[in-house]
Amino acid sequence: MALINSICQNLIKPKNLKKILRSKRVKILDCRWYLEDEKKGFLQYRNKHIPNAIFFDIDKISNKESKLPHMFPKTDIFTQFINKSGINKNSEIIIYDQIGFFFFFFVWILFKYFGFKNVKILDGGFHIWKKKKYELESGLRAIKYSRSYTQISMPNLIIN
């Protein structure tokens, strides 16, 4: 129950994201992923996404040494993604998936595990953003590299 309350407290309404969309502190992560087609999320991102969104590729970042799919990444791989994406500890991270379904949860927990405090979930996901006819963009975006992230993990969040 505490986890559900925590997630609910970390939802952001599309209209509120729209207001802060251009803030330099805001980093938006497109986490769309589909079990039946691992490339579909990226293709959808490339076609249309929320302005300034960065694609979060779970297949690239996951721990490749695990026999199980999509396990938490090794620290160095996660740190590379964070730095490459221009994210730092002061960033306001907004994550979304296709419909606010389940994949956002994995990414939210991942960022919490690595010590990020300001992580929000777009309420309703990309589906609601698009339904409201809010601004979209297409293509890939250039990202400013940052070296400001120092890894802090919270292993007490993981049970083996």
Mark where each language-model region is.
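Cytosolic catalytic domains that perform sulfur/thiol-centered chemistry
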Residues: 1-160
